Each structure stands twice: as structure tokens, then as C-alpha cells.
């Protein structure tokens, strides 16, 4: 080494090990040494290695002390051709920098003689270095030419060269580092490190730099070393090669193996104990004897993963004791019949076939079934035994009881005329995915518990985000993105999670302005806002009560849309009262009237006052897959978070709500767990396999088929809207954009409640209700994939029939209270007799002058408490002229019966 190089401080890669080694004799007198320890599980398919599939790095000093932790925050294993994001943290758990490669950027060019041999002549790769605030401070460009060697250039955002690293084609172990003025700064080398045993050695990457080097340059050294290790020293074939002698394998670039005390025991075959016959030796004994002709050498075992940390800087878990593992031969078939959880494999196969056959028959006959059950609450208690069985029962008996006891009490959401709620489509592909997910039986606590499903969730969120054309700030993998998506169990949980995240962020910002403020004082002044959509406002109020903040419900316009001037006036009024606005919940096709708030008006108001804008698109969010619907998302760039439930619009059986945030770090701060393995999730630690079902759904149908299904859903909604608008007896109460129609009969709330009950009582249709601007309306959601125009026509005819049956009783029903209405509808036929109905609810004579409701109520009250006919000298009250004495009660009439009491429309 030159004189200039002798003055450098050598930094070597050291790993923790029990046996102390005299490093001074090996490497000379070193001070302030730092090194990189790269751990990687190369045998994740081996059963012994499955629980150690995480790839983390550490930076050590000469005294074997950890000075930096480098965490793989992408929840993906590091590969040469894959994206990664490495987060550098010091020993105090504070972020120092990030190394980000969003996706491999390689160009393979075959020119000249290289094309004849089929080799790559030019390879390029790029990695960004970010500070703890997410700002790019440098970008490294690796250029590998097969004939000229490796060159790494690190530049700042302005394009100025910070450091340059170069190695010739034949120089595989040393990379010279120079500054912007070509001044020699140090070297990056691949070094051999002894583990304390003369036969056990491993390799690592070491950085040498002078004492004058600043912290930023050290970070650049670190970034370049990781890029070299991943792109150059980490060839798979070289990694798996045996490491026998350090001298012969010095230039063979392989990943550093762990020290001796962390190595995986070599798999050995247990010697079967057999009695030896005279003159014969068992085959097992022959195989177990070492070969006398071959010299026994210590082979490099399978590379083991680093010791797992529950948290950075925490105590390391002790490794399990080394045990001899019997070699498994996959070619041998298991012949014995093994009971798995009380059922053999053949029994499960037969039972699964019966269940599938039953589901297919049920799906074929779904139109003949009732949409909703005709049962009273508590019916199942009388049918099931009071105590659990002591002994196991046959699966056939269980399936039979399911058909007889459970199915009659089910609401068939896949029925073509089930329009009450949002039916989850029973796609066969998603049912298969649900079966696979149930067999996995893994809740997915964090990456190490279930790597595949954790990574699949992150990827599916980006798939859906790109399909819906969400802003790139909401996606995880674009360059320098701080956003991302995660899956929650419901939209209510998503709303609560972002509410807590906004609360935490506002408290942090207020404390930065004035450190004297206490969290409790700030919390008492926080106020959130949402619109007066009844169902959603109730959910948001509950979330606000749990989060211990105030929730203010704002009025909407005639189209149930929250406007920007309304929000601005409310915020200014609360600021004058000393409150702190921090959260605004906007509607984007939610569950009530399917209204779309003007985000382009709400966004600037929220940005002006520093409030969190959350967009709840529980129902209509997935419709953004269709390009023609995206005009409704004007102003989505102002949003801080966005959530939707795919199962409410598409045919996926997805029991998840997809939540995207602009800054995932704020969501992590609000989470109960802040483990590096965890994606930025919310309250639940465990997670179902919703990502697996979404993956099956997207691949099975494709984006085009999903778009066609949404368009058909919207078309049927418009068809039903036109039918209702042509009928003068009904009025449509919302602006129908999707397939959700809110309508009511042109009468008061009591009559519409009776009409809704009568329609649902038939079992041929299922409708729901909601309250819009203090009016009771009937809510019809067309969402079943089996629904057609013929089904809508039959549902409309049924509604008209029930309306005609109730029309003669309209004036009586309108003056009833809730208790009287329930009695009128639900009580036996005795209450519904013509004389009893006429006595309790007298009809209005249309020939008499119009009376007020008070007069009608007074007359009804007098008739209610009059003496019975047998005890009074007066005859019973005779109905006024126009009374229909032969009118039968609604419960005793059928749609096909002759209606003799129809009134003129």
C-alpha cells in the first residue's frame, strides 16, 4: 500500500462471536473501525431455514460493537435484480439515511464479439441515498462493463460528483474510492474474517477511509458498499460454493458466512440399529461409515440467517439447540392413514366433494329461495341443544343440520333481487382462494410469520391503486414515495385508523410550535368534521368518541354534497372558539345516498388550515377502474388518505377494506406496533388472506372484465331509475350515479315504512332503508352479478302490488305512531279485522272538508278509549261515507287476490 494508504484507518467487517480473536495481530492497529455484516438466507426452501427468512444488516466497529442497524424496509428479500429499500439507523434507533432502488434499471447490450458468445457487455444500475426526511442527497450509478470493470459514480441532486469508485476487470477484491477532485479517500474491499477457528472462515465487505472523512461521506461509503455487495459479490453460484481454504478461495466472491457458533448443523442420516448377521454388514452401516480413501474436510454448511431481533437494539433470542435432523426423502409416499384434526385426508376429500356439490345445487336454485329469512329472533336457540356434545359427531350429520337449521335463517346476498346491502359476489375463483387461505392457517402477524402474504398485500395495493388511477403519492413503489396502501378489515376501522393518525400528527405539530403545551390540553381542543350522511356520520361519531375528540356534522346541499364554503365557515367559527380543526371526512360514493363531495373545494380549505382530508369511498371507489368515472375524482390530489371496499362493487369475496395514505410514516406512528417487520398496518395484529383473494380475482377476470361488470352495474341502476321516475306514485330522492337508488312513495314516513315491511315480507325481494334530510327513504342497491332487467321488472311489479294493497289504508297509516304501525303490521288477523281497523284507525271521508292531523288524532283517541259495543247503548262508530267495510287487512291479502278497495291514483 502507498504511504497515503498507510495513513488511512482500516475498517473491517466483523461479526459477533463468542471466542475472542486478537484483531490487532490480524489487521494491525486500527481505530474507529466500521464494517458491514451481510446476512442472507439462501435456502429458504429448506424446512430448517423457514423461520429465518429475514435479511438484515449490521455495521460493527473494531471492538465488535454495533454502530448502525440497516433494516430492509421493503418486506422483501434482497436480490440482485429486485427492488429494495435499506433504512440505516444508529444505536439510538434514530434514522440516519435510506438506500432506495425502486426497481432494477439494467440494460443488456450485446455488441461485437460479445454477441457471439452470448454475454452481456454493459450493465447499469441506480440507487438513491435519502436522508431521514426522505430527501434525495445523492444518487449512485453503477456501470459494469465486462471488459473494462466496474465504475460507481455518486452525484448530488444538482449533478455534482461526490465520490467515484472504480475497479478493473481483474481486480475483484479492491475498489478504490476518490473524491470530486480525484483525491484518494479510501478503499472498499472483500476481506477474509476469522471466526476463531482455523478451519472456519467467512468473507465480508470492509471499508477503509481516513480520519478526515465526514459523516456524509461515510454514509456514501456505506451505500456504495451495499451496492457492490448486492450487485457484484452476491452471485448465487458463488455463494453456495464450498469454502474450504481461505488462500485458494480468496478471490472467489461469495457472501460472508456466519461464525462457527451460528452455523447450521450439517444434516446427517441416523444409523438404523439392526442386528448384524455373521459375515454380513447392514447397508445402513456401510453408508454411515466415512470413506477411507477421501480426506474428510469441513464443508461450508448452509448459510444461516442472522439472529432475529424483536426490536432494534433489543436482546437477541437464543438459538435452539443443535439436533440431528433425519434426512427427508420426498420420493417416499406416506402410506399410513393419519388423522389431521380429527379427520383423515380421505374423509376430508369426500366431505369437501359433498360441500362443493351442495354449493353448486344451492347456486343453481338460488332464484327459488327467499331473499331474506322469515323467522323470529331467537329461533335457533330452540333448535340447538343447550350444551356442546361431549363426543365427536359425523360430518354428514353436521352438514345435514346445516341445511335444515342454518340455511333457513340465512340472507342470500347472491340472490338477483337482494338489494338491501352490498352483496359480496360469490365468485368461484375467490372461493378457491378462500379455501387455500383457510388451509394456510397463518394470521400474518408480520413479515417473518408469513412473507408471501405480507408482500402480496403490498403488491396488490399497488395493483389496485394503479387500476384506479390514484395519485402516485399513494403508491409504495414509485421513486421517493412516502405513501403506500394496506388492508384493514372494514371501512369503519380504516376511518378510525386515519382519525387517530391525524390526531397524533396534529398533537406532534402543536407541541413543536409550543413545547409548553400538554397532550391532554391539545386533545381537548381537537375537532373533526364530516357530512350529514346519516349512516356515515354515525360511524364517524363513534370513531371520534373512541379517539376522544369532537366530531361536528356539517349540513349538505340538496344533492347531499358537502361544499367548501360550508366547511370554511365551520372551521373559522371553531377557530374563534379556541378549537383546533384537524380532520375532515369527505364522501366519495358512500353507503347512504352515494353522494360525491366536491374534493376540489374541500382540499384547498383543508390545506389552508392544515387539516387531514380523508376520502371515504367505501362503495364507489372501485368504480374508478373505469376511465369514464374518473371525472368524479377531481381534487383527489388534495387528499391525505383514501379507502374503499372492493367487495361492495365487484364480484370478489374480499373481506377487506383497502386504505391508501400519502405519508405511511404518520400511519406507523399511530399504530400500536412499530416493528420493522410490520407493514404500516392498523389496530389488528393478525390479518386474513384478503390479498390472496384479490390476487385470484384480478388474475381470473382481468381488468377489462371488471370494467364491464361495473358498467353493467351502472346501466342497471339507470334502468331502474327511469322506471321509478315514470311512475307518479314514487319519487327518486338522490342523484343516481352508480347502481344505488333511494326512492319513496309520495306519502309520509309511516306509509313508506309499511311499504318496505310488506315488500320484504314477501321474500321475493330484499330492500333497505336510510334517512336523507330527515326523510325515511327506501334504498335499493343493484349489485348482484346475477341481476338482469327482467329481475328489476319483477321487483318493480312487486313494489307496485304492495303499494296498491296499502293504498286504501294510507290515511290510517299516516297518523299512526311507531308502536301502532308495528301492531298494525305484525299482529294477528284479529287486530286486522275490518271492524277493528275501522274502529282504531278511522278513515278520512274524501267528501268531507280536509281536517288537520290533530283532529284526526283526537278522533282516533276517542275511538280507542270508547266503551265496547256490548256495554254501550250507542251503536259502534260507523265509518264515514267512502269507507270500505269489506277491506281486508294487508297481512291477509295476497298480491294475486282481487283488490276491491283500490283508490284512484
From Swiss-Prot:
Basic and acidic residues composition bias: residue spans: 280-296
Annotated spans, Disordered: 250-296, 861-905
GO BP field: amino acid metabolic process; carboxylic acid metabolic process; dopamine biosynthetic process
Assigned GO CC terms: cytoplasm
E.C. number(s) listed in UniProt: 4.1.1.28
Obligatory cofactor(s): pyridoxal 5'-phosphate
Residues that bind pyridoxal 5'-phosphate: 492, 591
Sites bearing N6-(pyridoxal phosphate)lysine, chain numbering: 648
Gene Ontology MF: a single term: carboxy-lyase activity
Record has Cell wall biogenesis/degradation as a keyword: no
Biased composition (Polar residues): 889-898
Subunit structure, interactors included: Homodimer.
Protein name per Swiss-Prot or TrEMBL: Probable aromatic-L-amino-acid decarboxylase
Origin species: Caenorhabditis elegans
Taxonomic lineage of the native organism: Eukaryota, Metazoa, Ecdysozoa, Nematoda, Chromadorea
